[in-house]
Amino acid sequence: MPAIPLEHGLAVAGILFCLGLVGLMVRRNILFVLMSLEVMMNASALAFIVAGARWAQPDGQIMFILVISLAAAEASIGLAILLQLYRRFHTLDIDAASEMRG
């Protein structure tokens, strides 16, 4: 099975990262912001995999495991914060977070 060229893999990763960045800047809903962050993290993981496969190094797969574990931690903490904001303010608008005081 032929390998995907480096340029194509990095182009897909770049497009996914840019889409996640646009979603991060445009959306006001915290759930969509978290989803955009996940897309950006997966795009960076894809770039590591493509680069590691191109140069036949296992470092890309190691970084992929690191990125996936960081994404899981970010998702769990983000969803916990999202639930607390929804219980307190009954909205998922990101501007409600600025009203939160300790």
Swiss-Prot record:
NDH-1 is composed of 13 different subunits. Subunits NuoA, H, J, K, L, M, N constitute the membrane sector of the complex. GO terms for molecular function: NADH:ubiquinone reductase (non-electrogenic) activity; quinone binding. One of its GO terms (cellular component) is NADH dehydrogenase complex. Pfam families: Oxidored_q2. Its EC number is 7.1.1.-. Keywords: Cell inner membrane, Cell membrane, Membrane, NAD, Quinone, Translocase, Transmembrane, Transmembrane helix, Transport, Ubiquinone. NDH-1 shuttles electrons from NADH, via FMN and iron-sulfur (Fe-S) centers, to quinones in the respiratory chain. The immediate electron acceptor for the enzyme in this species is believed to be ubiquinone. Couples the redox reaction to proton translocation (for every two electrons transferred, four hydrogen ions are translocated across the cytoplasmic membrane), and thus conserves the redox energy in a proton gradient. It is found in: Cell inner membrane. The chain crosses the membrane at residues 6-26, 30-50, 62-82. This is NADH-quinone oxidoreductase subunit K. One of its GO terms (biological process) is ATP synthesis coupled electron transport.
